Amino acid sequence: MYLIFIIMFGYRRFIKFVFPFPATGIYFHGYTFPIGKLPSDLQLWKVFRRMIKYNGDHYLVALPILMLQPSMYVCTYVCKEVDIEKESRGERERTKKLKLFEIVLYYLSVCTPYWWNITAKFFIPFSHSSP
């Protein structure tokens, strides 16, 4: 489904559609993109290449994981402030909230494949009628 969406609408719209985070910037595997300024195709290719590298050394192993289990890489797509050098109290609180958001996304990304496994074990026996 994600692959069809990417083919039809392109990478940029896919990223804006799947990850609509309200923040000044999006931090994604070492790349910071300002909101409102879409990254170029070359930047996106670098990001996806780096993402594949983190999920597995072999492209053929990593691509099915990325397409079939999006929760495995949602945890790495975290919005952060572009300028966190200011020492005001509000920005420190915002940074703490973002760190908490990071932890929640990591927890969801780790648990979701297990939930999918449990769900598959529960529903697959009922989907096939016994002879």
From Swiss-Prot:
The chain crosses the membrane at residues 13-35, 60-79, 100-119. The keyword Transmembrane applies. It is found in: Membrane. It comes from the Eukaryota. Keywords: Membrane, Transmembrane, Transmembrane helix. GO terms for cellular component: membrane. Coiled coil: none annotated. It is a multi-pass membrane protein. Partially overlaps UIP4. This is Putative uncharacterized protein YPL185W. It comes from Saccharomyces cerevisiae (strain ATCC 204508 / S288c) (Baker's yeast).
